[in-house]
Amino acid sequence: MSKLIPVIKVNNLSFYYDTQKILEGVSMEIYQSKVTAIIGPSGCGKSTFLKCLNRMNELESEVRVEGRVEFFNQNIYERRVNLNRLRRQVSMVHPKPNLFPMSVYDNVAYGVKIVGWRPKLEIDDIVESALKDADLWDEIKHKIHKSALDLSGGQQQRLCIARALAVKPKVLLMDEPCFGLDPIASMKVESLIQSLRLRSELTMVIVSHNLSQVSRVSDFTAFFKGNENRIGQLVEFGLTKKMFNSPHDSRTREYVLSRLG
């Protein structure tokens, strides 16, 4: 394996909603150009952890973070951090498509336009490139000026990925990207993740309950589980193949076997 370069370093991270502790003492690294999967039972803080990686958690009220999250060696929780720039560099795709009520083109171009003025021809190229990167161009190139809300659920989710890719992030966070999709649409999203993994330097972090999918698309896996007080903790982190075939912790082994059989 080539040398692993940490893009994100998480050190002793704890997270609170008001006075309720959701995560406790999480430490791990996210490596450049690798896919890291976050797995674990429902309610163990996986999605909360994901949102800690670009401060999306701050969109909710009364939250508190302890510890450090470093993006290329800068603590993202320092006050001087530009949140708009951070969220462009560490972009997120949510479980359900959250498209704007506008055309396919305008959805993809939106993030590009708010960064600063660009000639229309340049934006056209960016939109086309992002749709191609999301394996969507050939399917919808004839209707990019029609409403994005008319697309199928799977196409809408890939459009959300295209919108994220358009601003050239360093890291793409995906929270259950196949949630609610039929098997065919889910497979297309999975194929897209595998394609991005092979042909780009993009770093991806994915929350998923589908361990079969995780085994196919990820390089590393982090297993989270609630403790006796139902506070999410990182139980084990390592190479996906090793985690699934010979985990160190009995709790990891029990969870993987219960999901994969």
UniProtKB/Swiss-Prot annotation:
SMART domains in alphabetical order: AAA
Assembly description: The complex is composed of two ATP-binding proteins (PstB), two transmembrane proteins (PstC and PstA) and a solute-binding protein (PstS).
Reaction(s) this enzyme catalyzes, per UniProt: phosphate(out) + ATP + H2O = ADP + 2 phosphate(in) + H(+)
Keyword Cell membrane: yes
Residues covered by the ABC transporter domain: 8-256
Membrane topology qualifier: Peripheral membrane protein
Binding site for ATP: 40-47
Keyword Iron applies: no
Name listed for the protein in its UniProt record: Phosphate import ATP-binding protein PstB 1
Annotated localization: Cell inner membrane
GO MF: ATP binding; ATP hydrolysis activity; ATPase-coupled phosphate ion transmembrane transporter activity
One GO CC term, this protein: plasma membrane
NCBIfam families membership: PRK14258.1 (NF010851)
Catalytic activity, EC: 7.3.2.1
Naturally occurring in which organism (per UniProt): Nostoc sp. (strain PCC 7120 / SAG 25.82 / UTEX 2576)
Annotated gene: pstB1
Biological process per Gene Ontology, one example term: phosphate ion transmembrane transport
Sequence similarity: Belongs to the ABC transporter superfamily. Phosphate importer (TC 3.A.1.7) family.
